[in-house]
Swiss-Prot record:
GO terms for molecular function: triose-phosphate isomerase activity. Belongs to the triosephosphate isomerase family. Substrate binds at residues 9-11, 172, 212, 233-234. Keywords: Cytoplasm, Gluconeogenesis, Glycolysis, Isomerase. It holds the Pfam family TIM. It comes from the Bacteria. The keyword Ribonucleoprotein does not apply. GO terms for cellular component: cytosol. The keyword Ribonucleoprotein does not apply. This is Triosephosphate isomerase.
Amino acid sequence: MRRKIVVGNWKMNKTVAESTALATAVIAALGDGCSACEAGIAPTYPALDAVGRALEGSGIALVAQNCHYEDDGAYTGEVSTGMLKAVGCSYVIIGHSERRQYFGETDETVNLRIKKVLASGMKVILCVGETLAEREEGVTGTVVSRQVTEGLKGVADITDLVIAYEPVWAIGTGKTASSDQAQEVHRLIRDTVKGMYGAEVSEAVRIQYGGSVKASNAEELFAMPDIDGGLIGGASLNAADFAAIVKAGC
């Protein structure tokens, strides 16, 4: 059975002090947690070290929101995998829709980043998803399958990779794909992985849902056969709400 994974993506929110306080509150809200669901937190770059220290011994993974595909050099504003690993990150989010939309991330650069993260020994959360226009055009399957196929091109082993389906039209809008809509795309993603790596690998890979997940809808979403947790945005900025979502995966 696949272990659920719930990751809070704090995006560009919270100072270092606020982030540390929120991480501490999340630990308290989770209590003993549950072995059936893995939890992670992705704060801003400046807060990674402090939040990582706050999370020590909690079992909650420290997650980075992005990275560069080069080890070092003249890449102003970027951060390397070595830097992230040095502060204790175990996962890196790659290809988030906001990175694709606002910062020119492409399937090609997503692929380069994935290879760099896996080579570093950290794990990847690969984000895929369609826009509202693409859904209305009926090309959701084509878009998502392409993002998976191109993102994983030349990647031989995806043992340390999680896929997050995030319909762009549902991120931060209050709109949520119905559990059946989400399940349909998750099944398509799993079938795409099956075509690339075989049935055993496709049944083992974890696929999160991201897009206005809340405590009130998490249990229904997580009950779907191909939904293995969530990549949580706004709701992860509230410790009680995030803890409730994690517990929905238990």
